[in-house]
């Protein structure tokens, strides 16, 4: 059917269309039905999405389109477009199969991920898939299929470098912002680091959230190549790239659900590393009573990453670290940035636990690449850090990402809370600390 495009003048974060409710009902359509939009241009441009029904915003014969669709189809206001109503996705059958505890085939997982990437599944349907993974889990074959399917939906960054390294944490520990310290240490040592990070899913701040307090984190592939050629490293948000679009859409729903299934966590990490061509990878797996995983699960995760490293021909080193309590002094993007700058700047004194962990992780990469002898990596990392070279490299990266250290600011409100009892702190609940920071506005409000 033919409709006129009406600009909704809104950015939804995903392709969004609206149809007049009465007109849709006459056609037998309901909210969450699937449609394909195609232009009459040569060559035609096409996008699939889910419809939303409204009473007044859109008239009969019109289709309301968000900014994402306008950009994708290069539309003009009032332009006529062909709208085809699509049958229910086969993916729903496969998602129900996983909910019933059955293993999915390569083709079935590919179908689901392709539909997520093509906007053929609604957010509630993606949530159902995430819940199925969370409740039923995935075996190693399924996880590999998931990794490969996620990579297929996006582009692969090709960058020539002798030592292309990466570091990732499974997360869950407040203040565990070691990446912005590890990256400049490694870059100052002559290693290349293309660090694509997520924004926070269940925590108060992800690496991208922290860096975004003082610099841009959204760049195109070509812009990233220029930054890395100039500085040897970058710290950017993976969601702005086209490398793993399906993963980004899954993460968006994970944030709403506040859950991060193990199979998806592994697939998310591995797909990003493979898509940017990382050869040497260190994975930090914090464990503890209120961490994402306990020691038993941490050991299982390590075995899985070790297996995947061999399967995909990558050198992966998993390090199990103490996740019994938060790291550093501040929780949230701005406060964590302040902590890491104090660690990087030789003229300031930063949190010792944050420094020690960062040096250990950076030292591991230095040893893996042969930049340091076995057992001497942490010592070399310490030397680079305290010489000021890492801080200079950090500032160089921030400048290349159109940043400025002066952009850092803090929230207007603060309160000192004193205990009514005397005693010693014997335990800190990571999840409660993260929840408090999120209630204060993190990570959306970077300066809370």
Place the predicted regions along the sequence by residue.
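Long, compositionally biased stretches
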Residues: 1-100
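Acidic, glycine/proline-rich low-complexity segments that act as flexible tails and inter-domain linkers
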Residues: 86-174, 213-214, 393-400
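Well-ordered secondary-structure scaffolds
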Residues: 101-106, 111, 116, 156-158, ...
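Active-site-proximal beta-alpha loop/turn segments in soluble metabolic enzymes
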Residues: 130-134, 167-168, 207-210, 245-255, ...
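Glycine/serine-rich anion-binding loops at beta->alpha junctions
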Residues: 164-187, 191-203
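Alpha-helix C-terminal capping segments
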Residues: 180-192, 272-277, 312, 368
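A glycine-rich helix N-cap at a beta->alpha junction
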Residues: 210-234, 303-309, 313
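Phosphate/diphosphate-binding glycine-rich loops and adjacent basic-rich segments that engage nucleotide
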Residues: 229-280
């Amino acid at each position: 059917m033919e409709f006129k495009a009406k600009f909704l003048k809104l950015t939804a974060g995903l392709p969004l269309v609206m149809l007049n409710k009465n007109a849709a009902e006459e056609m037998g359509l309901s909210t969450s039905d699937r449609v394909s939009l195609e232009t009459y241009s040569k060559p035609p441009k096409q996008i699939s999405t889910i419809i939303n029904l409204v009473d007044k915003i859109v008239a009969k014969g019109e289709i309301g389109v968000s900014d994402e669709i306008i950009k994708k189809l290069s539309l003009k206001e009032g332009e006529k477009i062909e709208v085809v109503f699509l049958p229910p996705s086969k993916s729903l059958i496969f998602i129900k199969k996983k909910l019933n505890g059955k293993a999915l085939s390569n083709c079935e997982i590919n179908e689901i991920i392709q539909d997520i990437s093509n906007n053929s599944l609604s957010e509630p349907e993606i949530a159902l898939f995430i819940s199925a993974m969370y409740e039923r889990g995935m075996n190693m074959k399924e996880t590999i299929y998931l990794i490969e399917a996620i990579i297929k939906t996006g582009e692969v960054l090709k960058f020539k470098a002798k030592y292309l390294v990466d570091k990732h944490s499974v997360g869950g520990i407040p203040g565990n912002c070691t990446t912005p310290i590890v990256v400049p240490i490694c870059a100052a040592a002559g290693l290349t680091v293309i660090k694509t990070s997520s924004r926070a899913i269940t925590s108060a701040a992800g690496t991208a959230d922290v860096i975004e307090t003082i610099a841009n984190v959204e760049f195109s592939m070509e812009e990233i190549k220029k930054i890395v050629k100039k500085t040897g490293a970058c710290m950017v948000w993976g969601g702005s790239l086209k490398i793993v679009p399906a993963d980004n859409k899954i993460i968006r729903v994970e944030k709403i659900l506040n859950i991060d299934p193990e199979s998806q966590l592994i697939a998310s990490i591995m797909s990003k590393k493979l898509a940017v061509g990382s050869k040497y990878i260190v994975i930090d797996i914090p464990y503890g009573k209120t961490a994402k995983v306990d020691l038993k699960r941490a050991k299982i995760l390590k075995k899985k990453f070790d297996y995947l490293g061999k399967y995909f021909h990558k050198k992966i080193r998993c390090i199990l670290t103490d996740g019994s309590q938060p790291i550093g002094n501040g929780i949230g993007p701005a406060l964590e940035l302040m902590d890491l700058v104090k660690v990087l700047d030789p003229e300031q004194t930063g949190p010792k636990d944050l420094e020690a962990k960062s040096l250990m992780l950076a030292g591991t990469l230095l040893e893996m690449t042969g930049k340091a002898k076995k057992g001497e990596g942490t010592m070399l990392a310490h030397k680079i850090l305290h010489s000021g070279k890492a801080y200079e490299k950090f500032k160089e990266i921030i400048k290349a990402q159109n940043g400025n250290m002066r952009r850092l600011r803090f929230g207007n409100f603060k309160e000192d809370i004193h205990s009514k009892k005397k005693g010693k702190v014997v335990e800190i609940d990571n999840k409660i600390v993260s929840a408090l920071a999120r209630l204060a506005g993190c990570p959306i409000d970077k300066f809370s």
